[in-house]
A protein has these predicted regions:
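Hydrophobic alpha-helical segments
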Residues: 1-155
Length: 155
């Protein structure tokens, strides 16, 4: 592990929730792509992720990265049961909006809007928060995501 924090160059830091792609910069040095071992590549699950500084940073702990990536893939890409992809992304956007992660909210809101074709509703969630007025089904999904995020036992 590096013994110092990186200080990113001047850049526009997000101040509001958005569906736009945000400029993510690490606070710790990601591994160089050339330094990735076969174990790192296995943990990435998809070799294309080696191009991403985000995933190369997570690769510093291959066991955690592999568990995180397999969990992520199962949550969002598993076609055997569960909610449609748009609503999985909606739940993730709501959880991110609730816990205040502008970066994760932007990713999941973008996917929720793309898959659902309900851009205005997704934008309302971002603008107004998890109390935004949505239709009955989407409100139930948002409420469940918030309850699970707040305290799993509340769910």
């Amino acid at each position: 592990m590096p013994d110092s924090v990186l200080y990113p160059p001047a850049h526009a830091q997000p101040v509001a929730f958005t569906k736009e792609q945000l400029d993510w910069l690490p606070w710790l040095e990601p591994l160089e792509a050339e330094a990735l071992t076969p174990r790192h590549m296995q943990a990435l699950v998809d070799a294309a992720r080696a191009k991403s500084p985000y995933f190369r940073l997570l690769a510093r702990d291959p066991e955690v990265l592999e568990a995180r990536t397999k969990t992520d893939k199962d949550i969002f890409y598993n076609p055997e049961g569960g909610l449609p992809r748009a609503e999985r992304e909606l739940a993730a956007a709501a959880a991110s909006r609730f816990n205040g992660c502008i970066y994760c909210a932007s990713v999941h809101a973008r996917f929720a809007a793309t898959y659902s074709k309900r851009d205005a509703d997704v934008q309302r969630l971002l603008d107004e928060g998890v109390g935004a007025e949505l239709d009955e089904r989407w409100s139930a999904i948002v409420a469940a995501a918030v309850a699970l995020s707040a305290t799993p036992i509340r769910f």
